[in-house]
A protein has these predicted regions:
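C-terminal helical "tail/cap" subdomain of flavin- and related membrane-associated enzymes
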Residues: 2-3, 65-70, 87, 299, ...
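Glycine-rich FAD pyrophosphate-binding loop
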Residues: 23-43
């Protein structure tokens, strides 16, 4: 297999990890097609990685301690109560628990992974792929300029709107879950009374029909940023094409959604957390419809899917970036074994599909527990919330599950 001509579609975290995995297994003729021509590192949202998964990914050579991060140690659950005011600006604390995660800024994390990809790998920004297809002796990739190139292997790392997925699993479309994630991030120095909120704490603020997760992430060039993700149903009414993967573009949140968010925080948030959300500027706010999808199979004889192209799990799982990096380690391990390419891809898919199915199931379970079937949070105390969480994450998979053991250490690049 080494020496084959390979295309990676998508140049973000999954694409960089895939290119690194391929290069380590002797595939040095690699072209990465990235549809955007802008600077990917400008994306400034948060990424959280469970400490256990970090240890595995660091051992595999995909993460390391030098990558700028913030360590979280606790998770604090808050709900608005009748006395949530100046004397209790954070609201009623329902529960405090251990929360061993590292948080990253997507942009710097991507830069670190991009820097690990050997210089011999060709990156083509602004190369939008429009179609992929398998042939009897290879695979074809067509780009927006009308060019069609032949490769021995295509790896689809092009996200939840994947074009490559259609060549592997025709007709599979991510299913809309019925609600949204509002996201925002901004410099920490904008935060008033920041001392009220421990930088090592992830806050879960719950309200009727949803919740928001808030934590700090590293700044793009130093300092820290406030990062938050709020999950709830959109307001009723026309003009919101949220049942399609082509929903509202990031960064273009219309008046209806902004007003709905403001009304929600005013009605249901303790004062401090409402202020945290309200300080987000329009250009820092975007909306992400929630979807589920699992490509099974996720490979053909010459094409493989990785990351969100293969598995779309809701972010409640706390394992989005982890899943992409785990897929890369599994692809690397399968290609190392020296089997024929179709057999190697089949072995990769078996391991990937098992992890992906677990994450999709967890995302659905947590989506029901936290959003569409959320309890009356006001009635829960510490013990009741602990029992509720154990039921919601019955498999104990929050933050990702353990990657199957590698048979040998990663090779130097």
């Amino acid at each position: 297999m080494p020496g084959t001509r390979v295309a990676v579609v998508g140049g973000s975290i999954a694409g960089c990890a895939a290119a690194l995995a391929l290069y380590r297994t002797g595939h040095h003729d690699i072209t990465v097609h990235e549809r955007t021509s802008g600077e990917l590192s400008a994306r400034g949202v948060g990424v959280a990685v469970h400490e256990g998964r970090y240890t595995e990914l660091a051992a595999a050579g995909y993460l390391d301690p030098a990558m700028t991060h913030i360590k979280l140690r606790g998770r604090h659950w808050y709900v608005r109560s009748p006395d949530s005011g100046p004397a209790a600006p954070l609201g009623r604390l329902i529960r405090t628990e251990s929360f061993d995660f590292r948080t990253y800024n997507w942009g710097p994390l991507w830069r670190e992974l991009r820097a690990r990809v050997p210089a011999g790998v060709r990156f083509r920004p602004g190369s939008a792929v429009t179609a992929a297809a398998e042939t009897s002796d290879g695979a074809l990739l067509t780009t927006a300029d009308g060019t069609t190139d032949r490769y021995d292997l295509i790896v689809g790392a092009d996200g939840y709107r994947s074009v490559v997925r259609a060549a592997v699993h025709p007709g599979l479309r991510p299913a809309y879950a019925g609600y949204l994630a509002w996201r925002g991030a901004y410099p920490e120095d904008r935060l008033p009374d920041g001392a009220l909120w421990d930088p090592a704490s992830a806050a879960y603020v719950v309200f009727p029909g949803g919740h928001v997760v808030l934590y700090r992430i590293p700044g793009d060039r130093g300092g820290r940023r406030v990062n938050w993700v709020l999950y709830t149903a959109p307001p009723p009414g026309p003009g919101l094409p949220l049942d399609s993967p082509g929903g509202p573009p990031p960064g273009r949140v219309g008046t209806v959604l902004r007003e709905h968010l403001a009304a929600l925080t005013a009605a249901h948030f303790p004062p401090f957390w409402r202020r945290v959300i309200d300080l987000t500027e329009p250009g820092e706010l975007f909306v992400q419809p929630m979807y589920d999808a699992l490509a099974s199979p996720g490979v053909t004889r010459r094409i493989a899917l990785i990351g969100d192209a293969a598995t779309v799990a809701r972010p409640h799982t706390g394992a989005g970036a982890v899943k992409a990096l785990q897929d890369a380690t599994l692809l690397e391990a399968a290609l190392r074994d020296g089997a024929a390419l179709p057999d190697a891809l089949s072995a990769y898919d078996s391991a990937r599909e098992a992890l992906g199915r677990t994450m999709v199931g967890l995302g659905r379970s947590l989506g029901t527990a936290l959003v569409t079937g959320a309890p009356d949070w006001r009635t829960l105390d510490d013990a009741a919330l602990a029992a509720w969480w154990r039921a919601a994450d019955a498999a104990g998979a929050f933050g990702g599950t353990r990657t199957p053991e590698r048979t040998e250490p990663p090779r130097d690049t």
